[in-house]
Amino acid sequence: MKFVLLFGVLLVTLFSHSSAEMLDDFDQADEDELLSLIEKEEARAEECTPRFYDCSHDRHSCCRSELFKDVCTCFYPEGGDNEVCTCQQPKHLKYMEKAADKAKKFGGKIKKWFG
């Protein structure tokens, strides 16, 4: 048991040391590059396709919801030969977002009770 504890402490120490070295290696050029990428991401976010709108022109242009990006889903309507593509949120991601919202609200209540 003592060996496991000693090994765990050693592992945590090495991990924190490597994390500190990685932070030291993050120089000004990397910061400028990161800022330019963030600016491009913000600019791209303004041009996204809202949910339930046509995304056939660019299938990767769907907007993000609170946690996940919507997906361009294509289908053929009944009795039609034309393919229709719209930005939609898959059901499993929708349920995950609802669960995350409920967990946030519950966490806030716990904070009020004990905080």
UniProtKB/Swiss-Prot annotation:
Main location per the UniProt record: secreted
Tissue: Expressed by the venom gland.
The keyword Thylakoid is assigned to this record: no
Pfam families (alphabetical): Toxin_35
Molecular function terms, GO-annotated: toxin activity
Gene Ontology CC annotations of this record: extracellular region
Disulfide bridge partners, by residue number: C48-C63, C55-C72, C62-C87, C74-C85
Keywords annotated in UniProt: Disulfide bond, Knottin, Secreted, Signal, Toxin
Location of the protein in the cell: Secreted
Signal sequence interval, chain numbering: 1-20
Propeptide span(s): 21-44
Family the entry assigns: Belongs to the neurotoxin 19 (CSTX) family. 01 subfamily.
Record text about domains: The presence of a 'disulfide through disulfide knot' structurally defines this protein as a knottin.
Name of the protein in question: U3-lycotoxin-Ls1v
Organism listed in the record: Lycosa singoriensis (Wolf spider)
